[in-house]
Curated annotation (Swiss-Prot):
The chain crosses the membrane at residues 19-39, 61-81. It comes from Thalassiosira pseudonana. The gene is ycf4. Seems to be required for the assembly of the photosystem I complex. This is Photosystem I assembly protein Ycf4. The lineage of its organism: Eukaryota, Sar, Stramenopiles, Ochrophyta, Bacillariophyta. GO terms for cellular component: chloroplast thylakoid membrane; photosystem I.
Amino acid sequence: MQDQIRQEKIVGSRRFSNYFWASLLLVGGLMFLLAGISSYLKINLLPFANTTELVFIPQGIVMMFYGTLSFGLSIYIMATLFWDIGSGYNEYNKVENLVKVVRRGFPGKNREILLTYPLNNIRSIGIKISEGLNPQRIIYLCLKDERKIPLTPVQQPDSISDLEDQAADLAKFLDLKLENL
């Protein structure tokens, strides 16, 4: 029975890089915000810098704007970490003849995203590899109606050989052909 069902866990937004950026943006945003407020009130709110000498109209306002923007972005990233957006699993079930793609979304009526496809509706397993400034290495579930459902999580791309091995192993398990997109 165990050789008929395969489940792959998908890590969502709870990755080290998101914790790092949320922390950095929070601290940096608060520092910029305090510097802008210090320039307006002429009270030094930062112990390591004298921000009372900043002119409020061009510099203080800009620092407050950037600080507010950075603070807001860090709150957004923290919310995605708290809700664990993008996590889930892919389940390949030969017993029920189904493939399930389950992901967590933002709170609301569509919090749990569930995509279910019968195995006879799947044409192949596809691999898309693009290099450059934003490299992408993605395994797709290619359906007969020409839709392509991504199966790999959004993260640092794996090596090409690892991705090809994963895709070949999945195609062999599901008895499907492998294609390059």
